Amino acid sequence: MSVSHTITFKDVCFTKNDRPILQKISGTFAAKRITTLVGPSGAGKTTLLKLCNGLLTATAGDIVIGTQSISTIPPTTLRQKVGMALQAAPMINGTVYDNLCLPKKLHNDNLSEQEALRFLEDVHLPASLLHQQARDLSGGQRQRVSIARTLVNAPPILLLDEITSALDHTASLEIEQLITQLNTKYGVTIIWITHNLEQALHVGHDTWVMIDGQLIEAGPSSLLENPQQHATKQFLAGGIR
């Protein structure tokens, strides 16, 4: 296993307004693999994701990327290393090209049209979209542009938060195939929050089950077919929402 792209949680806690959101989370997201995060709403999944790229800071414990504590990595460096795509796929006003240029502009750099076209190709979008207004894109196209924009910094780690939940079945399958291809082609370490348990099973190499801010069970995604923990069985049976 490549050590440099692993993310290790060591007794990580996060508290907000005296309310524990995450409680002593310990575990490792394996490098170059897709780990799906599942659990009921309010389990702390999005909070955990935000801790991975410094949008939030742990109240206690440590998060290590490779061998380096996240607390010692400057935020701009961290966010270049750990990309994030969200359910809403927010776009700035302007063209697809304007959106793809954004990560470079934030670091006083430029993205050529030729480079931008390569990123569109990576996410299976036609070159004709480059100068189209982002507001005119379909939901699936927006999500692909959002992923392409995240890839501009060539992050070895990619965080995905419910990126297919607002898409129809066909568009969701296309995004799943895309993410699997990106993982295979570039060896990107991917952590993917999903409420779709079927998706978690067939897309993920590994799965973490979170309930009430705790990591209940982790292992190969096949655990969703044969869970060991009672709480996981309850969740999968629909007993925990």
PLM regions: where:
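ABC ATPase NBD Q-loop/coupling interface
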Residues: 62-77
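Helix-to-loop junction immediately C-terminal to a conserved catalytic motif
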Residues: 53
